[in-house]
């Protein structure tokens, strides 16, 4: 294990009274420092800025309106990072604040720049402390308490391990807070099994809960990143995981040969619309090597521009691919169902292909 992404949630960073868990965070940073000094590269994805801001402002209940959440985050983010900076400094390590939004994943150039920046920081033995830029985010501020962000960062860096730290010992067969018979799940070999688990809701401090963690684990597993969900309050939890101790829930990864571009397209680029295709087009795409042509498109859903990502669904409604469209939703509605020669006669300025095969990834291909 060389590169590790560690995500710590709001319920681990702060208690129910909005105080930072200073002793716990000091232990976590010491654990990370030991890994870095041992030659490993660690990225810390940390929630808690909103809770930290609430404490400073004297706001006891987590705000529900986005402007209030953003204001609390603006107050808390700097203070939270300053605390991490002091803790890492105690171990002669430098921390770097990295704030990301979905737009950084949406645009390929921004995505590559973010990846290159993180890689350079890691080569310098700097610990990137990543959080969503809640002050400018909109829908992103409810993005699963950073779980999916952590998975996307792990995929971006092709990390060896994603660790999601929470206030429970891992995933259970049911919610242990309400069911005394709930059993800890030690290993998940098929990530699709996670959907069957009855996981609990988010804590008072956080936004995601275990459901966000299972979604992140499924995403990471498909991109060949192993995930461990464990209790962040356990001393030395990261070192224990890295050395192979039986700690938390381990979700195994699937080997993949997908390119960095296809992983970005599948997991980072937001989908702006959906294209329904006929059976012939679905079959041609599934066999690989084919582009999506207008003649195979039966319905267009959503509002999108050329260059946006769209989901492609078969007649039964199953998503079979994602790709970057060459035309807007408005143009595609005009030309769907047309053969190439008809398209050229009606709209000669449009491409013959709706999605070129080089800009398309089959669902499941990333696990191949």
PLM feature spans:
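C-terminal catalytic "cap/lid" subdomain
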Residues: 1-94, 98-368
């Amino acid at each position: 294990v060389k590169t590790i992404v560690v995500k710590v949630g709001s319920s681990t960073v702060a208690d129910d009274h909005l105080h930072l868990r200073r002793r716990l965070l000091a232990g976590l940073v010491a654990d990370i420092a030991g890994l870095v000094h041992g030659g490993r590269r660690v990225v810390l994805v940390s929630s808690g800025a909103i809770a930290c801001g609430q404490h400073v402002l004297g706001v006891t209940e987590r705000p529900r309106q986005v402007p209030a959440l953003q204001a609390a985050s603006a107050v808390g983010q700097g203070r939270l990072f300053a605390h991490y900076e002091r803790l890492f400094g105690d171990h002669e390590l430098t921390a770097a604040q990295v704030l990301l939004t979905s737009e950084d994943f949406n645009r390929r150039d921004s995505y590559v720049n973010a990846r290159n920046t993180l890689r350079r920081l890691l080569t310098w033995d700097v610990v990137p402390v990543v959080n969503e830029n809640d002050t400018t985010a909109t829908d992103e501020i409810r993005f699963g308490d950073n779980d999916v962000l952590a998975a996307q960062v792990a995929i971006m860096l092709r990390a060896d391990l994603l660790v999601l730290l929470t206030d429970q010992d891992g995933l259970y067969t049911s919610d242990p807070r309400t069911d005394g018979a709930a059993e800890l799940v030690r290993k998940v070999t098929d990530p699709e099994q996670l959907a069957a688990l009855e996981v609990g809701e988010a804590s008072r401090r956080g936004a995601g809960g275990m459901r966000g963690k299972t979604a992140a684990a499924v995403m990471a597993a498909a991109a060949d990143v192993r995930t461990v969900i464990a209790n962040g309050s356990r001393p030395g939890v990261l070192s224990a995981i890295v050395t192979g101790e039986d700690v938390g829930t381990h979700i195994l990864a699937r080997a993949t040969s997908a390119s960095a571009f296809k992983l970005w397209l599948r997991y980072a680029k937001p989908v702006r619309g959906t294209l329904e295709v006929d059976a012939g087009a679905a079959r041609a795409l599934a066999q690989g090597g084919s582009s999506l042509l207008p003649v195979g498109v039966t319905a267009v859903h959503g509002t999108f521009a050329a260059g946006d990502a769209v989901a492609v669904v078969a007649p039964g409604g199953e998503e079979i691919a994602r790709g970057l469209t060459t035309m807007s939703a408005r143009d595609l509605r005009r030309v769907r169902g047309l053969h190439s020669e008809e398209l050229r006669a009606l709209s000669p300025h449009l491409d013959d292909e709706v999605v070129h095969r080089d800009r398309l990834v089959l669902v499941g291909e990333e696990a191949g």
